[in-house]
Amino acid sequence: MASKRKAAAMNAAAAEEPVDPSDELMFLCLGGGNEVGRSCHIIQYKGKTVMLDAGQHPAYDGLAALPFYDDFDLSTVDVLLISHFHIDHAASLPYVLAKTNFRGRVFMTHPTKAIYKWLIQDSVRVGNTSSNPTTQPVYTEQDHLNTFPQIEAIDYHTTHTISSIRITPYPAGHVLGAAMFLIEIAGLNIFFTGDYSREQDRHLVSAEVPKGVKIDVLITESTYGIASHVPRLEREQALMKSITSILNRGGRVLMPVFALGRAQELLLILDEYWGKHADFQKYPIYYASNLARKCMLIYQTYVGAMNDNIKRLFRERMAEAEASGDGAGKGGPWDFKYIRSLKNLDRFDDVGGCVMLASPGMLQNGVSRELLERWAPSEKNGVIITGYSVEGTMAKQIMQEPDQIQAVMSRSMAGARRMPGGDGEKVLIPRRCSVQEYSFAAHVDGVENREFIEEVQAPVVILVHGEQHNMMRLKSKLLSLNANKTAKVKVYSPRNCEELRIPFKADKIAKVVGKLACIQPPQSIHPDQTATPPLVTGVLVQNDFKLSLMAPEDLREYAGLNTTTITCKQRLTLSAAGVDLVKWALEGTFGNIEELPEMRRAKNGQNGHADKMITDGDDESKQEDADEEVASLVAAYLVMGCVSVRYRTNGEVELEWEGNMLNDGIADSVMAVLFSVESSPAAVKRSSAKHSHSHDLPEVNPHHSATPEERLERLLWFLEAQFGQDNVAPVTTPKLPPLEDVDDKNKNEGEDEDAMKTDEDGEDAQLQERQQKEIERLHKIGIPVPGVSIKVDKMSATVWLEDLEVESSHKVFADRVRAVVERAIEVTAPLWG
């Protein structure tokens, strides 16, 4: 018994339909795919290209740190969006603008642009984030300064349209100025989170979900996979406990941080704690960064972009400063009481305990690496990692608590020793300091990320910015949630340079504007009513992926287009067809045609000189035709309301119409009718006239008494024309009918065996006798030869002329021969009497 088909099986055919490439979203990771670092993603849809971020990998040097820009033509990029100023998201932007064929526009928020200028300039001076002195920088400081004016700054919650691409930035909560971007291309909404945080901290606004917008594709980070953060209060308490314990044992605390971002949050925490605990105020807190002073100025400038806590603190301190008569207004939320800025280590008196926040956060080079190599040999000191550590960096390595670390900034310091093996370049330093980690990285954890994805409710999720094992765990978790959903969420985690294509089919809706919008739509029609809704025609205009239907006269107002009317004319001459025949042919094809009022001559007698055959030889009529120099209009018709047909006395027909797609097709059809009006059988029959001739014709058709040989000759001619002269030959041996009464041979079963056998010579004689009788029989009925043999290549067929049976071992060839023979019989019939 047949089983019932499932709905999924019935919809399989529709799902397998080919997809138009223009309806596919192409996503390509040039960096940040199954890794953290050098984030760079490409989005292509409907011929538009958006590039997301342009970072460098902190663990690599030179060109190896760049995204795989050679795998994509950057000249096709329309818009480049930078989510925030961190090295792994923005550091290769000067290279893109100065060293590639990129011709698009670059956007970032105002705080990001302000910080980006100083951050990249400092990174170039330090060595372009390279710990290898032999590596050449990928761009210079001058490249950065020259390309900086190309960057355009935008505000949160403002929508901008560039090349039909709509972008809207939203707060991301990661660092000051960090943005999530809503990108709309042809009605497809793509939401890119960048690095984002949903945690309420001391100075940043947490990430928000766009309200009232249906997101089709969500591109989100997966830095921590499904791991969960310790609650914020517990982390702060544990951090301060570790710092105070190191200070109490007489050590120094090194906290490697990015120059901007989490460092400011940690400074707020430390300054608040020091203010509440006077016994620790004797230990100085340093913020060591070349950008320290400039960074604080930027943070003081963009207080309005921070959360309510900072704004409240700013108002309180400004009020206190005003009450105390401080006209300079010093006392804002970023004017710390217990923290000192340290531009470089030359002014640092390394005596006694202290807390040092130093950049860069990955400990690859710079002040943080120099202090690590200086303080690592002492067990009193401690290193506290507060941010995310990228694979391959010293920050990631030291978390494994190795016994030794490689010296980069201080190769000749005391206590260092060279590696065995004679490698003079690598110098090792013993590590005895403590190492602890407390995450203040401002990235969402697994729970927050999953809740955010569920809140967005996008049918397609693309995971980026995460190590492979973390990303795969998050992907598996998201896919497991599909079990309880009717609409399954598609989750992708592409690798670098792995092209991802996702089909998106959307209904195309046109907005009716102008005069056409005044037409009332048809009311609901009951099944018993047969009213036909009115037909609306207009011009369909596409602008920025939006379709509008309007009347041609509204193009200037609603589309900004000027219209031009093109009048087309075509002339042809008919030698035999007159106006009556032309009108009859047009009416037969197009129905009723309209007669134009410009006709100058009466309809009677306007048959045209070419329509009537000159049979009387009247010299006077011939003279009138010869004297007529200017052809006058005989008739004028309007076909299908758009094509004018004018017939003149000299047989010239002129077609005139307004050029457009519909009218051009009708005009082509009219010309096809006119070109065939003189030769079509219907037209010939229409214009024919009855007549009689007095010729003396023989009463008997000369072909009536053709002999069988003549008919055979005609048949052979026809077959030779089809198959070739050498491939057709008569068959002289007839096809014998089956023997009757075959049992007569066995009527004397009791006779001797020798009597039952027939001599071989006797059989041949009997066969020849039967063949001769068959040939005589065929001759009597008028068949000269039994059959015809036809050979083409390795195929052969025999046609028996009595019943026109075709014998061949090739069925297709036999069918072909049978069709040709039947046609030959029709031509030469009757063959045989």
Curated annotation (Swiss-Prot):
Q: Does the keyword Nuclease apply?
A: yes
Q: Which UniProt keywords apply?
A: Endonuclease, Hydrolase, Metal-binding, mRNA processing, Nuclease, Nucleus, Zinc
List the SUPFAM superfamilies hit by this protein, alphabetically. Answer: Metallo-hydrolase/oxidoreductase
| Parts of the chain that traverse the membrane | none
Q: What are the disulfide bonds?
A: none
E.C. code:
3.1.27.-
Query: Where does this polypeptide localize?
Result: Nucleus
Q: Where is this region: Disordered?
A: 600-624, 685-707, 728-767
Identify the main location: nucleus
UniProt function note: Component of the cleavage factor I (CF I) involved in pre-mRNA 3'-end processing.
In Swiss-Prot or TrEMBL terms, this protein is called Endoribonuclease YSH1
